[in-house]
Swiss-Prot record:
PANTHER family noted in UniProt: 4-DIPHOSPHOCYTIDYL-2-C-METHYL-D-ERYTHRITOL KINASE, CHLOROPLASTIC
Protein's pathway: Isoprenoid biosynthesis; isopentenyl diphosphate biosynthesis via DXP pathway; isopentenyl diphosphate from 1-deoxy-D-xylulose 5-phosphate: step 3/6
Reactions the enzyme catalyzes: 4-CDP-2-C-methyl-D-erythritol + ATP = 4-CDP-2-C-methyl-D-erythritol 2-phosphate + ADP + H(+)
The name this protein goes by in its record: 4-diphosphocytidyl-2-C-methyl-D-erythritol kinase
InterPro entries: GHMP_kinase_C_dom, GHMP_kinase_C_sf, GHMP_kinase_N_dom, IspE, Ribosomal_Su5_D2-typ_SF, Ribsml_uS5_D2-typ_fold_subgr
Positions with a binding annotation for ATP: 96-106
This enzyme's EC code(s): 2.7.1.148
Catalytic residues of the enzyme: 13, 138
Gene of this entry: ispE
Length: 290
């Protein structure tokens, strides 16, 4: 008898700041950041198979199966572990694609964590993190599974305690090429290393934001609009921007302005989507690895 699909959350993340502190000889940029999980995101659906096949059962628009991070993650884990089982996989998308919110990386991490349990592999967290890094620089954070002070190219992770907060995240419907932003001659690549103490005093920023604001006025407009309610900042390389609020009620009141009025799309110059989310201290699947 065929098993039913199991559903696993794949939470979005935001970068509370992002400094570019240097560049490695291989071209990867060195960074400092704080990553925070949100109680909003995709859902990964997995059904174990007995026949070793790994299949995507529903298409993700714009993502061919061979480059689907979920399929790549499952295949990588299968080869690494020598597991003889397979899986059917599909994703219900909620996290905006190309927003700097880690959607694809989070999906891949949830596949690794879920299959570690479903296939009874009992791989340790550090082993999964190493596998995840080969899929993308953000994947290790989601397997780490806690609010993190991040350094290196994204692989050096240190747990950090953050105050409770609610976030309004808005995303203009535009495409931003992360590669083009990192290749920009205007990008600051030599920001002096900062400290957790400086971050806690908010003496930080997003180095990518200046370049994106210049090249994409829609992001500039979103930041201007959201800053009317609370200090706004871009996540990652955009296009999503966010602001923090002390209460769910305050955040939802701002989100209502996003959803109910034509004012924002007219001001920004394109369609804009938004959501409200509480910051998470831990990934919901963190217990799936030790």
């Amino acid at each position: 008898m065929m098993q039913d699909f199991h559903a696993y959350p794949a939470p979005a993340k935001i970068n509370l700041f992002l400094h570019i502190t240097g560049r490695r000889p291989d071209g990867y940029h060195l960074l400092q950041s704080v990553f925070r999980l949100l109680d909003f995101g995709d859902t990964v659906h997995i059904r174990p198979r007995a026949d070793h096949l790994i299949r995507r059962t529903e298409n993700t628009p714009g993502v061919p199966e061979e480059s689907d991070l979920c399929i790549r993650a499952a295949t990588l884990l299968q080869r690494h572990s020598g597991c003889k089982l397979g899986a059917d996989i599909y994703v219900t998308k909620r996290t905006p694609m190309g927003g700097g919110l880690g959607g694809g990386s989070s999906d891949a991490a949830s596949v690794l964590l879920a299959l570690n349990q479903l296939w009874h592999l009992h791989l340790r967290r550090e082993e999964l993190i190493t596998l995840g890094l080969s899929l993308g620089a953000d994947v290790p954070f989601f397997i780490f599974g806690e609010s993190a002070w991040v350094e290196g190219i994204g692989e050096k992770l240190q747990s950090i305690q953050l105050p409770q907060a609610y976030y309004v995240v808005i995303t203009p419907r535009i495409h931003i090429s992360t590669a083009e932003i990192f290749a920009s001659k205007q990008l600051t690549r030599d920001t002096n290393p900062t400290t957790i103490a400086a971050f806690l005093r908010d003496l930080v920023h997003n180095d990518l934001e200046t370049v994106v604001r210049q090249q994409h006025p829609e992001v500039e407009k979103c930041l201007q609009w959201l800053s009317r309610f609370s200090k706004a900042r871009m996540s990652g390389s955009g296009a999503s921007v966010f602001a923090a609020f002390d209460s769910q009620e305050s955040a939802e009141a701002v989100l209502a302005r996003v959803n109910e009025a034509r004012e924002l799309p007219q001001f920004v110059g394109c369609e804009v989507s938004g959501f409200c989310a509480k910051g998470l201290d831990q990934h919901p699947l963190r217990s799936f690895a030790t």
